[in-house]
Structure formats: C-alpha cells, structure tokens
Amino acid sequence: MKTYTKKQRDLKKNLIAWLLVTPSLIFMLIFTVWPVFRSIYLSMTKYKLGMKAPDFIGLENYISLAGSSLFWKVMGNTLYFALITIIPSMVVGLFLAAIVNRKSRATGFVRTAYFYPVIMPMIAIASIWMFIYMAKNGLFDQMLSSLGIKPMNVLSSKKTVLPAMAFMYVWKEAGYLMVFFLSGIQSISEEVNEAARIDGAGTWTIFRKITLPLLAPTFLFVSTIALTNSFKLVDHVVIM
C-alpha cells in the first residue's frame, strides 16, 4: 500500500486547487487583464481605420487631452453629477432598507417594487423620464401648472438639466444600494437591539447609536459602488 508524506499530500491538494482555479484565471486574463493592458497601449498610439499597425506616440494623447477645455468641462460636469447623486442615493437607499427590514405581509412586494427600477434598462428609464420632463405636455410641467408655477423645460436649461438627470439617477440607483444596506442591517445581531430596547432606547436612538455605527464598513463599500456607477453613465445623456 502506497503512503504519502505530509508534504506530498499538501502538494497534491495545492495541485488540485490550482487545476480548479485555472479555468477562471484563464477567463480573467483573456477578458479582464488583457483588455486593460491593450487599452493602455492603444491610448499611447495613433491609429486610424485602414492602418496596418498603430503608430506609438507615447503620452501625446494624454497631453492633448489635458490641454482640451472640452475635456475639463466634461470632467467638471461629471464630478458635479457625482456629488449631487452619491449622497442622496445613499440616503434614500438606507431609508428604503430601514423600511423593508420591518416584517410585514407586504415586505416582499415592497422590496420588489423598490428594486424594480434597478433591473430596468437605462435606455427605458431615460425614455420614461424624458416624457415626464417634456416641455408643456410633460407630467412635471403639468404638475407645476396645477400649483400655479410657470412651466419650465428642465432639459433645455443649463441650470436644471443636471439636477433633473440626477433625480432620475437617484430614483434608479437607490434600490440597488438598498440591497447592500439591507444586508448590512440584517447582519447586526438582534440581541444588541433587544438589549437597547430593554434599556429604554427608542427606534430612532437604536438606529442612530447602534445601526449607523455598525454599518460603517457597508457605507464604505456602498460609497465606492455609487462613485463608480456615477462615472460610467452615458446612454441616458444621449437619449435625454
């Protein structure tokens, strides 16, 4: 009967582990690592359709971009959009998570309703909100008229177009962030909350002094996700 030493057994386990991980590593190299390095290389070249091979020009593209006023204008708008969407979407997401965390017969329906905008394509959402913001006949202008306020075409004004898009984005993104906050809230031991209730703490006190501090890691993760998502929106701008 053949016996193996501890070192041989460990080597065998490691070999099996690497064999199991290899397919995932191959896919990651092909579809993640290689495109990143390829994109970096192409950003340092001059390439046009019909050329056999791109001409390497170093950092000229980056220098040209840094000297473009249009680039800095776009960056400013993007940063402004991120600032006016990240905090509101996180606040609304946390509020929704606190609501759906309560046990009731309608909890499943409410969670689905809040999350539904997340699974809708941005093109469809942008089209819906474009009709809402439509001048004169749109739902938003009709609401303003009913309140005695002069209608405004929010999508044609520099002062209102970004806030209008930000409102639409928060409406879509809040349900997505709600899922992470809900997971964080449910990971908090109920014994901690119960002990606080026995000591006479109310719902708001428990939320402010127990739930929020324990959600610090979740806040860090959610803020990173929200920042990343706010920088990669394109389709709604084209449609609206």
Residue ranges and their predicted role:
Residues 4, 9-240:
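A structural signal for multi-pass alpha-helical bundles of membrane permease subunits
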